[in-house]
Amino acid sequence: MDDYKDTLNLPKTLFSMRGNLSKKEPNILKSWNENNLYKLIRKKNQEKKIFFLHDGPPYANGNIHIGHAVNKILKDIIIKSKNMSGFDAPYIPSWDCHGLPIEQKVEEKIKSNQGEISTTEFQEKCRKYAQDQVEKQKKDFIRLGVIGDWDNPHLTMNFKNEANIIKTLSKIVQKKHLYQDFKPIHWCLKCASSLSEAEIEYSKKKSDSIIVGFKFKYKSIIEKLFDFQISNKKEIHLLIWTTTPWTLPSSKAISIHPDFQYQLIETERCYLIIAKELVEKTLNTLKIKKSIIRNYVKGRFLEKMICLHPFLKNIDLPVILGKHVTLESGTGAVHTAPDHGLEDYIISQKYNIKTSNIVNFKGEYISNTHDKLDGVNVLEANSIIIELLIKNNTFFHHESLIHSYPHCWRHKSPVIYRATPQWFIDIDQKQLRIKLLQEIKKVRWIPEWGESRIGEMIKKRPDWCISRQRKWGVPMSIFIHKNTRKIHPNTFVFMKKIAKKVELEGLQVWWNIDSKEILGEEYQSYEKILDILDVWFESGNTHTTINYKNKNYTKKNADMFLEGSDQHRGWFMSSLIISTLISEKKPYSEVLTHGFVVDGKGQKMSKSIGNTISPNEIVDTLGADILRLWVASSNYSNDISISNEILKSSSDIYRRIRNTARFMLANISDFDPKKNIISKENMVLLDKWAIGQTKIVQEEIIQHYNNYNFHAVIQRLMYFCSIEMGSFYLDIIKDRQYTLKKHSQERRSSQTAIYYIINSLVRWIAPILSFTADEIWSYLPENNSQYVFMEEWFDKLFYLDQDDLFNYQFWNEIITIKHEINKFLEEAIQNKTINNSLETSIILYVSHELSNKLKILEQETKFIFLTSDIQIKLYDTAPKNAKKSKIVPYLKVSLEKIKGKKCPRCWHYFNFTKKNIKNSDICNRCILNTIGNGEKRIFI
């Protein structure tokens, strides 16, 4: 038997089957860097409409984690897809460079000589540390394949940006939204600083839950009010319930609801006053079996009654009215400590009850609080408080309670409310809160629930505490009068002057500057405020400083913000407040949020659990494209699961896409688009369908990109590669590709289709599988651009004419029939009736309509079903043993083992007769394709 291998057009490519991504990707990155790919893209797109995704600044501290990778990859996918959709989509990476974590890292390094270092020296060390962290993280982000202006990132610590932050605050001062107050704010004992709402996270905490009695000072008034004669031997207690016993030393009043009914209940021990609806529950908790309800009054009648502090001597506490009191739990009365609760503070203000602070910045009671409490940390004081209550006969009940409690997001430790003099932005001044709620309605929130979430936060949020008692941050840059404590009337002008100096020398200027230089002779009357700004104020201001606009950009805001769902109360909120306050406009048109990364069991990533996965480890072992594919495949609107099994699944998807691309590249190795392109009119019908189907898929994929449904992009890609191409089109054209004459129109027709399809496919995957797309692009003949990222979606695809007899409906029916026949063939192979489809004669029993269409295809029909022989008969003529399709109506199939000889060249079976050329063992078709004029194909 002759070897006919040299007569076949076998596929050939250097594009490897294995990705070897971890080895190849660094070289691809080197090419991008050496040729400055980002600038090439921007230059090519410079006249196009801008799409600007504003990068939320990650904190410049520590290695990147898997959450960072998810965020940056999602942004990169969007940027690249927008560039390919005809936009100029710049990407300017940002970093948040000030704040406590950096201070703490520097403090750890200089512990031995901390007292010898000046504030400005300390700030310089912080700046150096932050810059080092930026460089480290930048390297990791670049390794993920994220393309951006890495040489010119936005750093909040750049002098110009520090100055701009001061300018923004000056405008807020000018609009009279800044004020100072002595009110309770979240305070972290480990940070020794105030915290903003965005720096708080809620976790479960075990607390001491106690019920305490506040004795009424004047029994006779209560006796008269309840119209009942009180026993002289029994005290009257207004019961309160609290989970923060340590706040009792700060009690200034007891709040009750004006409209609730409060019952006077006599027990063996004393008289109790409890809200009517909570009496039964409270008595059960106290295990009081014998009691008598003596009378009741509305809460408003108890207003200004005087109670005694439960253990501090000679302190009278008034009963006050507040609608913040509820019947959900407790007793219907709450002790009121304006130092340690915002609602307590607000209600105390109405009664002119002054706020004082008996807890220092370390969380310790100050001197003269109580001889048992002085110097004690408040979080360790509950047991002492309970002892004092027992001693004073005001203790009624104690139990442990596990509940949700605010914690510091950095230290994961419980925080307290502590009253200190701080600076606030007034959220209700000039109807700012109402404007914020109006602006969020103009934003597209993805997912949609983001709008209601941030809306509820805006409705409930307190005024924004923007001051911090630290050193590494932008200074507030204001002076206040030493006596009146009011801001200098020319503060707006002074702040602009200070900002100019900061722009030249950095934030350290404020600590070094002589007040006289700014204030002149007034300097002796004013005090320089050394507080710095909340880092959320800094990051919330970034949208005002990044220069992303050109002549084609007319919007007043960024197109998109994209961050984790925790940023509704963080960066989204701070940016919205500042933008609305300064310009009365929203800072973004779209806000997209993603969930958090969890392990395969749905558990939160935690070092203590040991379930964390480093993005760098994934990149070093599997490659960045696998990580990018995992991100794109995930429904990021929910929490995103990751595990070795999930990454293996991503690798399997990758392998399918890569092998599809490899097959196509291998089959156009001898194809020159300048010479070999076949026009639509002269193409084989199946190739026209393939191009038309590719166009349909491209429209779907573009739509998914536009809607940010990247998992849908992957699903559509997989179906296209596996089903429409892999098990249908590419499978069918192998025969034509390999066995027809090399330069035949029929073969060049399928190569034209492949060329168009791979040109489309490489663009579809470029935003996600960026390294692989770049590699594929390097193997494609006749590229217009150096890099695929400089291209737009492929524009040479065309639709099938819907009026054609063989339209999409026909081909969809054929695909379905082919899948059905494949099932029957697999069954026959398993039963060892046949070995493969080519040694099978297939008889199709179909409807008149389909029979007429298939007969037009004549002998080419067999190539669709990869068989050596096919017969088309009417459905009604099918024998009883024909297999009936459960999916396709009017379809029955009979399979018979074919008779004849197997052609050693094309592997089809044929009847060997004397008509065959002498000494030839190949079929007539192969004879035509080797020494003849070539086989003709019209349809398949």
UniProtKB/Swiss-Prot annotation:
It comes from the Bacteria. It is found in: Cytoplasm. L-isoleucyl-5'-AMP binds at E563. Pfam families: Anticodon_1 (PF08264), tRNA-synt_1 (PF00133), zf-FPG_IleRS (PF06827). A motif ('KMSKS' region) lies at residues 604-608. One of its GO terms (molecular function) is isoleucine-tRNA ligase activity. It catalyses: tRNA(Ile) + L-isoleucine + ATP = L-isoleucyl-tRNA(Ile) + AMP + diphosphate. This is Isoleucine--tRNA ligase. It comes from Buchnera aphidicola subsp. Acyrthosiphon pisum (strain APS).
